[in-house]
Every structure is written in C-alpha cells, then in structure tokens.
Swiss-Prot record:
Name of the coding gene: proB
GO cellular component: cytosol
Record-listed ATP binding positions: K15, T174, D175, T216, G217, G218, M219, I220, T221, K222
EC number(s) on file: 2.7.2.11
Entry protein name: Glutamate 5-kinase
Residues reported to bind substrate: S55, D142, N154
Record keywords, A-Z: Amino-acid biosynthesis, ATP-binding, Cytoplasm, Kinase, Nucleotide-binding, Proline biosynthesis, Transferase
Enzyme class, first EC level, given as a word: transferase
C-alpha cells in the first residue's frame, strides 16, 4: 500500500456500516461510536476535513422497537428508520461534543444528488459546514424513500458524497478485514488484497454478494462504491472498524485493509462527468471577452453574458455560445434562466442590487465548466 495516497488526503468521507454502529443488532455500540468520534477529532486537529456517512437508523429503530427480525414491509422499515434516527443523532452529537466538535445531520436521497439544483445546494451546504469546522453526519433519508431502502444503499451514498464534495479519499469501515480473493468464511485459502485498482473487473467476482442480517450490503457494494468514487479521483480504503484506530492509521497512510486506487486525477474525472452525463437545458450567449476568459481557464461572469436562451433552473447544464454561434463550452449554471437574464451584462458587484441576493459571484464556476 502506497502510504502517500491517503496520507495526502485533506478531505475524507468515512462510512460506517450498520453491523458496526449497532454491534450486530444488539443496540447502538456506544463505545465504538465514541471511539470513531475521538479518531475524527484527531484528524480535525491535523486540519483534515471529515464527513461521516453512518448507517444504523433502521437497525437502531429495530432494537428500540424490540424487533429481532428485519421487516420486509417498506412502511415498517420507514417507521424503524424514523425511530432509530433520533437515537443515532443524539449519540453522535454527544460523542463529538466531548471533543469540542459540532455535528450536523444531513439526510439525503439519491434524488437529491440526481437533481442538479438540489445537488448544488447540498454541495454548498456541506462545503460551508466543513469551512466552519463542523462534522456533517449523513444518512439515507430512509423515512421518505422507497426503492432506495435496499441492498448496499449507504456504500453507494458514501461514494456519491465523495463525488459531491470532491473528497480525496473514501474510508469504508466494515466488519471484515478488507477485500479478499474469495470469501474467507467459506474458503480458508482466501488472502487479503492489500491494493488494487478501483474499477478492476476481477474485483467484483472476488467480492461475492453476502451481507449481514442487520445491514443491507455486502463486499460487492463496497467494490462498486469504490469504482464510483474513483470517477472523481477519490481512493477508497475498505477496512475493519474493529481494528485499533483504523481511521487515524488509514489517514496517516498505514497499510490497513484494502486500498482501491483511483487512476484518475480529480479534476479530469469531474470534467469527464460534466462532458458525458449532462443534458443541456439552455444556452448562454457570450461576448468575445467572455470567450477569451473561458479559454484562459477562468469562470464565466455575468458581465460577459449577452443573453440567456431557454428555460432552466439553477444547477442546470447550459451551453456557452460564442458571438458567431459556436458552442465553446458547457457547464452548470449557478442561476436560473430568469435570474441570468436579469444579471446579464452586470458586474459581480451589481448582482445583489439587481436580485437582492447573491448565490455565487459567477454564473458558471470554472470547476463546473468544460470547454467543448
């Protein structure tokens, strides 16, 4: 395991599974939760930013309601999630408060990250919380979703959050030592894989598909999550949450568990996402000065926009059109079409006078823009 890969990570997402959070379904494991908070506090002292993705609401609710068997009814699962989330948040808040850290609860659905406007709002909120030194604690909003309450949700959610905040690393803590060449519970010759490339097709065959009766995912979902996180440049570590100080040791670059390495630089991965996965909702007509600015790698400011065509909301993908009608770039607009028309040809300082507020100083930030 290359020690520099995670040691250089400044922004990390840590995902802990239900089996760890609830001590295999016997109630919240207070000792483990307090220990994770202690480890994350150490990382905060090292000026590392950490987002915690925690499973456990449904499992905690099952324990509180006295249910030994995971129900199959969606509404019963949602009821358990509602009951359990209360206990989960209270415990995390108390654990981090011992180290002088504030926490924030964020409940997401996959739809929140698929919708561009909500995606930008979630990203802005998370970035603000991290700037404030707060530890965001994220869980799937199981009480309102339907299809998302299924196999592997929070492994996927951890990867999506890593993409969302452009994290350097995703740490997935589980009840296994890492990824093996075969299921070690069935094959005594199975060996631990120390390092591999995220997205290697052979890994999914090694991972199998078994989960626990408390959680919903198995190792296969973690391998798929690592592949997804790698698209935005994040390396993924899969390790046992029952090791001594796994979060600290991984963040320091120690060889714990399995490291699945992203072969893509973060910015390149983000640009690829912008190029391949966005449907254009409108067009911004630019002046020559704005065209030159974009070619120089700068953001698109309102003063360089002549007109906005089409009807689109904040976060929508738009094409940037040169004065001679050529598409020169595309990106995510920080303003809806109505707002864009109002602030076109205005300086950044004039945005607030025009709209009464400022979402962002740019119409399209350079990180959300790719040249055509």
């Amino acid at each position: 395991m290359n020690p520099t890969r995670l040691a250089n990570a400044k922004r990390l997402v840590v995902k802990v599974g239900s089996a760890l959070v609830t001590n295999n379904g016997t109630g919240l494991d207070l000792s483990a939760i307090n220990d994770w908070a202690r480890q994350i506090a150490v990382l905060r002292q090292q000026d590392k930013e950490v987002v915690l993705v925690s499973s456990g609401a449904i499992a905690c609710g099952m324990q509180r309601l006295g249910w030994a068997k995971r129900p199959k009814s969606v509404h019963e699962l949602q009821a358990a999630a509602a009951v359990g989330q209360m206990g989960l948040v209270q415990v995390y808040e108390g654990a981090f408060a011992k180290h002088g850290l504030h926490t924030a609860q964020i409940l997401l659905t996959h739809d929140d990250l698929a919708d561009r406007k909500r995606y930008l709002n979630a990203r802005s909120t998370l970035n603000t919380l991290l700037e404030l030194g707060v530890v965001p604690i994220i869980n799937e909003n199981d009480t309102v979703v339907t299809d998302e309450i299924k196999f592997g949700d929070n492994d996927t959610l951890g990867a999506l959050v890593a993409n969302l905040i452009e994290a350097d690393a995703l740490i997935i803590l589980t009840d296994q030592q890492g990824l093996y060449t075969a299921d070690p519970r069935k094959d005594p010759s199975a060996t631990l894989i120390n390092e591999a490339t995220a997205g290697d097709e052979t890994l999914e065959g090694m991972a199998g598909g078994a989960g626990t009766r408390i959680g919903t995912g198995g190792m296969i979902t973690k391998v798929i999550a690592a592949k997804r996180a790698a698209r935005s440049g994040a390396h993924t570590a899969i390790a046992s949450g029952r090791e001594t100080d796994p979060i600290i040791r991984l963040a320091n670059g120690e060889p714990v568990g399995t490291l699945l390495v992203s072969q893509t630089q973060p910015l390149a991965a983000r640009k690829q996402w912008l190029a391949d996965h966005l449907q254009l909702a409108g067009r911004l007509i630019l002046d020559a000065g704005a065209v030159n600015a974009l070619h120089a790698g700068k953001s698109l400011l309102p003063i360089g926009v002549i007109a906005a065509e089409g009807e689109f909301e904040r976060g929508a993908a738009v094409a940037c059109i040169s004065p001679d009608g050529r598409e020169i770039a595309r990106g995510l607009s920080n303003y809806g079409s109505g707002e864009a028309r109002l602030i076109a040809r205005k300086t950044t300082q004039e945005i607030e006078n025009t709209l009464g507020y400022v979402d962002e100083p740019e119409i399209i930030h350079r990180d959300n823009l790719i040249l055509s």
